[in-house]
């Protein structure tokens, strides 16, 4: 079961917090999971975007817990394929697609 945490944290702080709770930052593996996340963000988040477990490492995006990246919800245009150095963490908002975002920004986050 997923749980939204509204206390804004950097991506690394959010990951550490989730792992201290014996969970991880959430993976969004389907359109259904995206819709559920959008609803939860609208109802609870204190920031426009929230952190997910999506991270750009090496030359690709991956879920930090090892889930396969079969479902993808990037915006058209492909800017996520080679993100700027500071835009290497995945976030999602109330209705839109995934975003490559600055890992040092403090956002609400979802653990599962």
What are these regions (language model features)?
Residues 1-112:
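Extracellular, disulfide-bonded carbohydrate-recognition/adhesion ectodomains
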């Amino acid at each position: 079961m997923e749980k939204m945490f509204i206390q804004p944290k950097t991506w690394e702080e959010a990951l550490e917090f989730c792992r201290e709770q014996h969970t991880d930052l959430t993976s969004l593996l389907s359109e259904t999971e995206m819709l559920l996340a959008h609803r939860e963000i609208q109802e609870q988040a204190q920031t426009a975007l929230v952190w997910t477990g999506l991270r750009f490492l090496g030359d690709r995006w991956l879920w930090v817990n090892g889930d396969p990246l079969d479902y993808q919800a990037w915006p058209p245009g492909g800017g996520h394929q080679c993100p700027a150095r500071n835009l290497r963490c995945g976030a999602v908002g109330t209705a839109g697609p995934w975003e490559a975002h600055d890992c040092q920004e403090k956002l609400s986050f979802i653990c599962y």
